[in-house]
UniProtKB/Swiss-Prot annotation:
Low complexity bias spans: 15-31, 166-179
RNA-binding as annotated region, ranges: 29-160
Functional summary from the UniProt entry: Packages the positive strand viral genome RNA into a helical ribonucleocapsid (RNP) and plays a fundamental role during virion assembly through its interactions with the viral genome and membrane protein M. Plays an important role in enhancing the efficiency of subgenomic viral RNA transcription as well as viral replication.
Protein's name in the database: Nucleoprotein
Taxonomic superkingdom: Viruses
Organism: Avian infectious bronchitis virus (strain M41) (IBV)
Keyword set includes Disulfide bond: yes
Ranges for region Disordered: 1-32, 46-68, 164-196, 238-258, 326-409
Modification type Phosphothreonine: residues: 378
S-S bridge residues: 320-323
HAMAP family from the UniProt entry: GAMMA_CORONA_NCAP
Residues bearing PTM Phosphoserine: 190, 192, 379
Single GO MF descriptor: RNA binding
Length: 409
């Protein structure tokens, strides 16, 4: 595991770090998005929101005099087969003097703007809080200590101890492997003659047959959550989730076969036996914190010891030889095999199937590509949509949780 990487360079000062939970940074940003997640209308054509309390999201970083701003409506559209399709409005909060309506004074009348202020707010003050760079910071979870919007609106619950994506995480895991020895001798239970990789592959197949399922949306969430919490969904390559494989630095585990097959490669499940749990990584590692311009980097150094008398010792060594700095290589036994005939007898009239009568093929109408549909959206609408999450019809994927570290071999 490796230390977090900066996602971009900026001249802005680094945000003040508080380890008690995520909070909007005290400094401005070069982005143009709201610091907070949106409230979403439950259906189309809903009137502007009304709030039980002040309507200002909780932000402990600001003084009470600075707690004022506006909610702005964003009409959003979703690409569809017949063109763009309207979806219920989203409303985003900005502090006075920031965001798309930065030129307005508090209380100025404008369609799609709802002004709000907390108790003791000085509405003549124009905020220097700025707006969010969505490539560097997650949306901050909405909390209203004095009452939120009316029942026509909702917002997705985000726990305070983490964000949804890996773009803003400053702490990622880095681990090599040397630590208090874990029990890796469970292989003795089934006998040393049982091949480790074959058993790992069987675990995945058995779990998939049991019908454990996740939706397309869930698979996408697994692959794009905070970097240090990601897992590889089915039908994803390793580099789609954790970036390209490298040599001699972070991200150096996995050969080309493992990268292509992802969790279908039995070697993945086998090696997850040696990967520390979250608690083991935290309390059994050498933890090194380091403040960087983009945030706090945490490095975890952990060692797992496989005893030489372990029945699967040779298999673990073999996998490491193949996969450590393995980019650009494949296992020697992973050669494509020619397809063989089901029978060694030559095909004759007596044993050959009769040719089927060929039906004329129907001409298929060309499908409308997504990029053609996307052209129906303006640049402003595409930017608005980028801040929202759409809920597509679930595409069911058969999935087993064996490769997520829950099963020991």
């Amino acid at each position: 595991m490796a230390s977090g990487k900066a996602t971009g360079k900026t001249d802005a000062p680094a945000p003040v770090i508080k380890l008690g939970g995520p909070k909007p940074p005290k400094v401005g940003s070069s982005g143009n998005a709201s610091w907070f997640q949106a409230i979403k209308a439950n259906k189309l054509n809903i009137p502007p929101p009304k709030f039980e309390g002040s309507g200002v999201p909780d932000n402990e970083n600001l003084k009470s005099s600075q707690q004022h701003g506006y909610w702005r409506r964003q009409a959003t559209f979703k690409p569809g087969k017949g063109g763009r399709k309207p979806v219920p409005d989203a409303w985003y909060f900005y502090y006075t003097g920031t965001g798309p309506a930065a030129n307005l004074n508090w209380g100025d009348s404008q369609d799609g703007i709802v002004w709000v202020a907390g108790k003791g707010a000085d509405t003549k003050f124009r905020s220097n809080q700025g707006t969010r760079d969505s490539d560097k910071f997650d949306q901050y979870p909405l909390r209203f200590s004095d009452g939120g919007p009316d029942g026509n609106f909702r917002w997705d619950f985000i726990p305070l101890n983490g964000g949804r994506s890996g773009r803003s995480t400053a702490a990622s895991s880095a681990a090599s492997s040397r630590a208090p020895s874990r029990e890796v001798s469970r292989g003795r239970r089934s006998g040393s003659e049982d091949d480790l990789i074959a058993r790992a592959a069987r675990i995945i197949q058995d779990q998939q047959k049991k019908g454990s399922r996740i939706t397309k949306a869930k698979a996408d969430e697994m692959a794009h959550r905070r970097y240090c919490k990601r897992t590889i969904p089915p039908n994803y390559k390793v580099d789609q989730v954790f970036g390209p494989r490298t040599k001699g630095k972070e991200g150096n585990f996995g050969d080309d076969k493992m990268n292509e097959e992802g969790i279908k490669d039995g070697r993945v499940t086998a090696m997850l036996n040696l990967v520390p749990s979250s608690h083991a990584c935290l309390f059994g590692s050498r933890v090194t914190p380091k403040l960087q311009p983009d945030g706090l980097h945490l490095k975890f150094e952990f060692t797992t010891v496989v005893p030489r008398d372990d029945p699967q010792f040779d298999n673990y060594v073999k996998i490491c030889d193949q996969c450590v700095d393995g980019v650009g290589t494949r296992p020697k036994d992973d050669e494509p095999r020619p397809k063989s005939r089901s029978s060694s007898r030559p095909a004759t009239r007596g044993n050959s199937p009769a040719p089927r009568q060929q039906r004329p093929k129907k001409e298929k109408k060309p499908k409308k590509h997504d990029d053609e549909v996307d052209k129906a959206l303006t640049s402003d609408e595409e930017r608005n949509n980028a801040q929202l999450e759409f809920y597509d019809e679930p595409k069911v994927i058969n999935w087993g949780d064996a490769a997520l570290g829950e099963n020991e071999l």
